[in-house]
């Protein structure tokens, strides 16, 4: 049994600095085909991938994201929940399918499909020697992204992904993840608070030491402090409204 894929994914880290070398059409096609091979719920394939190499479109999306690597990369993908094609099928169907694809379950199916496709692309890109970074920041202004990309009803932008050759001075490294025993529950969920707090305290120490070493003492916050800052920020509270404007999560 080979550990090749295991070792590959264990080295994963986000790359935020890329060389100015566009991906070839052949590479883009292979990445998309790898993504399409992902599992999909009930064969709905409720996603689409928008590939972007137009610099003006990239710049418009950078304004939404606020991140320079939305422009400075080898290629940009945007992953969307896509029920537009299902809506077209619905126009000639004898039953009302919108009750399904416009439901909360439909939203979950589309989001999971898009995520599985994207992870296939990420692993394939890293196997080819490229780096990637996911871009949830495109949800900072969903309405603007829908306008930039001409998204019809029943299509919703979930996240993007920048891909490219890592820059020579790119020095990212895999961050320590939550402990195995904290995320893996055998047979049923173990919610004992004392155990949970103890595991998180150990992890907070690990993350603080990681940042301390990576930044020569300039950064020492814990994982819990990061979570408090991020979730306490109350960002993107318009998601339900934007989803419903797209024709999704109507029930």
Curated annotation (Swiss-Prot):
Pfam families: Nitroreductase. Belongs to the flavin oxidoreductase frp family. InterPro entries: Flavin_OxRdtase_Frp, Nitroreductase, Nitroreductase-like. One of its GO terms (molecular function) is oxidoreductase activity. The lineage of its organism: Bacteria, Bacillati, Bacillota, Bacilli, Bacillales. It is an enzyme of class 1 (oxidoreductase). Keywords: Flavoprotein, FMN, NADP, Oxidoreductase. The keyword Oxidoreductase applies. Its cofactor is FMN. It comes from Staphylococcus aureus (strain N315). Reduces FMN, organic nitro compounds and disulfide DTNB. Involved in maintenance of the cellular redox state and the disulfide stress response. This is NADPH-dependent oxidoreductase. Its EC number is 1.6.-.-. The gene is nfrA. CDD domains: NfsA-like (cd02146).
């Amino acid at each position: 049994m080979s550990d090749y894929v295991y070792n590959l994914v264990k080295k994963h880290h986000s790359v935020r600095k890329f060389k100015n070398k566009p991906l070839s059409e052949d590479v883009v096609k292979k990445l998309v085909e790898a993504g399409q091979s992902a599992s999909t719920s009930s064969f709905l394939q409720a996603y689409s991938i928008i590939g972007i190499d137009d610099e003006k479109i990239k710049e418009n999306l950078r304004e939404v994201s606020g991140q320079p690597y939305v422009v400075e990369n080898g290629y940009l993908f945007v992953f969307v929940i896509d029920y537009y094609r299902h809506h077209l099928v619905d126009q000639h169907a004898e039953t009302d399918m919108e009750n399904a694809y416009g439901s909360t379950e439909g939203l979950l199916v589309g989001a999971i499909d898009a995520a599985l496709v994207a992870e296939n692309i990420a692993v394939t890109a890293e196997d080819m020697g490229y780096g990637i970074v996911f871009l949830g920041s495109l949800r900072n202004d969903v309405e603007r992204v829908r306008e930039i990309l001409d998204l019809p009803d029943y299509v919703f932008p979930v996240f993007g992904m920048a891909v490219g050759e890592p820059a020579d001075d790119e020095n990212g490294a895999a961050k320590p993840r939550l402990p195995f025993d904290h995320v893996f529950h055998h047979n049923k969920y173990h919610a004992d608070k004392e155990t949970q707090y103890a595991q998180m305290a150990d992890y907070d120490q690990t993350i603080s030491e990681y940042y301390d070493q990576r930044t020569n003492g300039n950064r020492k916050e814990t994982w819990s402090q990061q979570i408090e800052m991020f979730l306490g920020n109350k960002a993107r509270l318009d998601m339900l409204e934007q989803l419903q404007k797209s024709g999704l999560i109507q029930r």
